């Protein structure tokens, strides 16, 4: 246990794949890292590492801009977004650009502007990345001490952390300002089937906002994923932005406490592992959010959630059979339970049949038909609006269940249908990315801790078995 508090672990430790510590050049012989170790060659070259990061940002923004324009070029306003394989335009529509009542797209010009702005930004980032990778100083410490750093300088590292937190807080406030002052955002709960509106009274009560964090993640509780109104959503961003900005100022002004210095490993690879761990958590949360939440990810743009499509199917057939004369309140199904309606474990009236498992779904097309005890039988008989029928029929046939090489996977679809919901894409991609980032977190954390403890020398490539094998001929 003594090594845990040994001063050795505070020295600049990096785990090499090859056994030399001279880091002047960028080839395998001088850095100890082969080409496939990526930016590890640049660990101690802050100027070149800046070039790599700015170039990476340029590639990301270039993808965003070009994919945005690609989706605009292929967009058909008459079809729902979720039928067209779009993954970027739904985000822009959710922010209230180009959308009219009921989620109808009335103007695609804002989407075009977004794509062009991202392309222009990517050109600037690309130029900066190439400049710093090829022309700019190898290290920033001498010429630009404010931007220079050494990995073991804990005060500088927490200052950089603080700057990042302030930028994240500013990003959260951008959404708050858009919702409050700059045209508002799309609210799927607006009466009559959704509309863009300004958020006038955002929720600032800490009891409500932090109550979400204290909820169980299971069942009808749903942790923060259960947020079902824009007031709470924007209020949460206000709180989060404030906390990030104040936390950022704190980290810039203070030095790490003694317990922090002892608890953490202070090396480039350790910071990489912390970042990957955080991104992994973000990925898993985003996966659950896009899969279950139809407020932050409106079904008008992303397609229905799984429970929503299932409940929509029950609702559609209830409407049909009621028109044909069925008594939906008393009809029995094959199991003796109610065919169309039954009671939940807590006594509410819910849809019967297989969709009973999704009885606590909340959706804007269904909520107007509820009373104090669940679904209201008189409302189901007299108050169903045409837009509710249309929307549920649409959602019933677009469940987020299809696979790439199969039909949609719901009994109501004909064999020719091959539909993959953007909800499926976004949820599965974020789950997979979250998982891989978690593996990366474990890998780099293990290497960083081993290097700090002083018993990991890297992989000795000189004794690699393949070097002693007869060449394949």
UniProtKB/Swiss-Prot annotation:
GO terms for biological process: photosynthetic electron transport in photosystem II. It holds the Pfam family PSII. InterPro entries: PS_antenna-like (IPR000932), PS_II_antenna-like_sf (IPR036001), PSII_PsbC (IPR005869), PSII_PsbC_sf (IPR044900). Residues 1-14 form a propeptide. One of its GO terms (cellular component) is chloroplast thylakoid membrane. The keyword Phosphoprotein applies. The modification Phosphothreonine is found at residue 15. The chain crosses the membrane at residues 69-93, 134-155, 178-200, 255-275, 291-312, 447-471. It is a multi-pass membrane protein. It is found in: Plastid, Chloroplast thylakoid membrane. Keywords: Acetylation, Chlorophyll, Chloroplast, Chromophore, Manganese, Membrane, Metal-binding, Phosphoprotein, Photosynthesis, Photosystem II, Plastid, Thylakoid, Transmembrane, Transmembrane helix. [CaMn4O5] cluster binds at residue 367. Binds multiple chlorophylls and provides some of the ligands for the Ca-4Mn-5O cluster of the oxygen-evolving complex. It may also provide a ligand for a Cl- that is required for oxygen evolution. PSII binds additional chlorophylls, carotenoids and specific lipids. The modification N-acetylthreonine is found at residue 15. GO terms for molecular function: chlorophyll binding; electron transporter, transferring electrons within the cyclic electron transport pathway of photosynthesis activity; metal ion binding. It comes from the Eukaryota. PSII is composed of 1 copy each of membrane proteins PsbA, PsbB, PsbC, PsbD, PsbE, PsbF, PsbH, PsbI, PsbJ, PsbK, PsbL, PsbM, PsbT, PsbX, PsbY, PsbZ, Psb30/Ycf12, at least 3 peripheral proteins of the oxygen-evolving complex and a large number of cofactors. It forms dimeric complexes. One of the components of the core complex of photosystem II (PSII). It binds chlorophyll and helps catalyze the primary light-induced photochemical processes of PSII. PSII is a light-driven water:plastoquinone oxidoreductase, using light energy to abstract electrons from H(2)O, generating O(2) and a proton gradient subsequently used for ATP formation. Belongs to the PsbB/PsbC family. PsbC subfamily. This is Photosystem II CP43 reaction center protein.
């Amino acid at each position: 246990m003594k090594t845990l508090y040994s001063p050795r672990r505070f020295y600049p430790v990096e785990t090499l794949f090859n056994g030399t510590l001279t880091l002047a050049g960028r080839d395998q012989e001088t850095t100890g890292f082969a080409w496939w170790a990526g930016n590890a060659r640049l660990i101690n070259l802050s100027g070149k590492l800046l070039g790599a990061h700015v170039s990476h940002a340029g590639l990301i923004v270039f993808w965003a801009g070009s994919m945005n324009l690609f989706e605009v070029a292929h967009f058909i306003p008459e079809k729902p977004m979720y039928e067209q394989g779009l993954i970027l335009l739904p985000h822009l529509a959710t922010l209230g650009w180009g959308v009219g009542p009921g989620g109808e797209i009335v103007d695609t010009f804002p989407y075009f502007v977004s794509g062009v702005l991202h392309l222009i930004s990517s050109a600037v980032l690309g130029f900066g990345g190439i400049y710093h990778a090829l022309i700019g100083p190898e290290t920033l410490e001498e010429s630009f001490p404010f931007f220079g750093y050494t990995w073991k300088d804990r005060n500088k590292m927490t200052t950089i952390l603080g700057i990042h937190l302030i930028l994240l807080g500013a990003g959260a406030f951008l959404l708050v300002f858009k919702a409050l002052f700059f045209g508002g955002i799309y609210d799927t709960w607006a009466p009559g089937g959704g509309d863009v509106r300004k958020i006038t009274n955002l929720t600032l009560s800490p009891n409500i906002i932090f109550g979400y964090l204290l909820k169980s993640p299971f069942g009808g509780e749903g942790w923060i994923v259960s947020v079902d109104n824009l007031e709470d959503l924007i209020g949460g961003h206000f709180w989060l932005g404030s906390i990030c900005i104040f936390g950022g100022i704190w980290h810039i002004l203070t030095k790490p406490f003694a317990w922090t210095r002892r608890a953490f490993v202070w090396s480039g690879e350790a910071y990489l592992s912390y970042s990957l761990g955080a991104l992994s958590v973000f990925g898993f949360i985003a996966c659950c959010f896009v899969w279950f939440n139809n407020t932050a990810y409106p079904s008008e743009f992303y397609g229905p959630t799984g429970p929503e499509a299932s409940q929509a199917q029950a609702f559609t057939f209830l409407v049909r059979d009621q028109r044909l004369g069925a008594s939906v309140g008393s009809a029995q199904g094959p199991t003796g339970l109610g065919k169309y309606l039954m009671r939940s474990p807590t006594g509410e009236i819910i849809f019967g049949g297989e969709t009973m498992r999704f009885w606590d779904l909340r959706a804007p097309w269904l909520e107007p038909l509820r009373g104090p005890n669940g679904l209201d039988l008189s409302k189901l008989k007299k108050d169903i609006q045409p837009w509710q029928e249309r929307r549920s029929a649409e959602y019933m046939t677009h469940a987020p269940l299809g696979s790439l090489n199969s039909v949609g996977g719901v009994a109501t679809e004909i064999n020719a249908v091959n539909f993959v919901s953007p909800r499926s894409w976004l949820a599965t991609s974020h789950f997979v990315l979250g998982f891989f980032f978690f593996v990366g977190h474990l890998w780099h954390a293990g290497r960083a801790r081993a290097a700090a403890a002083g018993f990991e020398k890297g992989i000795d490539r000189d004794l690699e078995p393949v070097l002693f094998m007869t060449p394949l001929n």
